[in-house]
Amino acid sequence: MDPTLLALGALALSGAAATVAGCAEDLESDVGSQSNPNSQVQLGPQMGNIHRYFNKAISGEPVSYGLYVAAAGATAWALMGMNLNPILAIIVGSAVAALVHGAYSVSAFLGRIVGQSKNFGQPVYMDVMMGHLGPIVGHGFIAVFCMLFAAYLAVNALGNPFPLPLVALIFGITVGAIGSSTGDVHYGAEREYQKYAFGGGIPVANQGDIDIMAETGIRNGLDSSYFCSKLGGPLTGLAFGLIIFLDGWRSILGNIIGGDLITKAAIAIVVGLIVVITTLLLNRKIEVYARNKFGPYTDR
């Protein structure tokens, strides 16, 4: 079969895996209130809002997911060096990362909540910890597995010159940054502040005054992930999937059109610049359209 067709197929599969990984990563962070909304949940008890959110301030998402995916990649790489089947190696590596993820989540939750118990009266709800841990580890496993699979395709099918653990580290940092900047805003700036008028942002005076009541009963992280699965999670997956697909596509296009190595690299760089400029222009037009369509925010 034509190597170019094989590369295109591997790229499409890698982009699909990255899309699933991005969605799962964002929903996992929503269950655990990590990154963007974490500081608001942290301030809740200080504002008199005793909550039942799972609050795991391990670190920012880029750092934590860089750790998880790199640990999974290093484990899988070592197992593949021992002639284990690549799929099994990726599964075992993702399982190791899930164990690390779960351990950090429990220690971060208990440490953060216990630190607020004495001064602000925030109880440590053990049922919250046990009920949220499964979705956190499960979504994390899916995200790490898909990212590690995409990294494996990048190294073995798309000709990436770097070793698997390093590519996995880069993918983990990238998806964490996208989840923190794209998907978590849907939770931290909207879901936690639904009692305030939409579009008003989060004034300093309102920080920590989070919603603690759901449509029925008391709100928790599982409610938040359900809400964010409608927009924030899919947007994160779409953003990460497009980054992986377009980045690989420009390299393949350079290999098809170019002759020598320098020409191929130059074509790939030019195509990448065209994609970035086109994206900037589209973002600007969408922003201007939205502002003209819905008008400025007022406090009426």
From Swiss-Prot:
Lipid bilayer topology: Multi-pass membrane protein
GO cellular component terms attached to this protein's record: cytoplasm; plasma membrane; vesicle membrane
A Pfam family matched in the record: MtrE
Compartment(s): Cell membrane
Pathway: One-carbon metabolism; methanogenesis from CO(2); methyl-coenzyme M from 5,10-methylene-5,6,7,8-tetrahydromethanopterin: step 2/2
Catalysed conversion reaction: 5-methyl-5,6,7,8-tetrahydromethanopterin + coenzyme M + 2 Na(+)(in) = 5,6,7,8-tetrahydromethanopterin + methyl-coenzyme M + 2 Na(+)(out)
EC numbers, comma separated: 7.2.1.4
UniProt cross-references to InterPro entries, sorted A to Z: MeTrfase_E (IPR005780)
Single GO molecular function: tetrahydromethanopterin S-methyltransferase activity
Top-level taxon: Archaea
BP-aspect Gene Ontology terms: methanogenesis, from carbon dioxide; methylation; one-carbon metabolic process
Keywords: Cell membrane, Membrane, Methanogenesis, Methyltransferase, One-carbon metabolism, Transferase, Translocase, Transmembrane, Transmembrane helix
Transmembrane segments: 62-82, 86-106, 135-155, 158-178, 226-246, 261-281
Similarity section: Belongs to the MtrE family.
UniProt function note: Part of a complex that catalyzes the formation of methyl-coenzyme M and tetrahydromethanopterin from coenzyme M and methyl-tetrahydromethanopterin. This is an energy-conserving, sodium-ion translocating step.
Quaternary state and interactors: The complex is composed of 8 subunits; MtrA, MtrB, MtrC, MtrD, MtrE, MtrF, MtrG and MtrH.
Protein name, entry field: Tetrahydromethanopterin S-methyltransferase subunit E
Organism taxonomic ancestry: Archaea, Methanobacteriati, Methanobacteriota, Methanomada group, Methanococci
Gene: mtrE
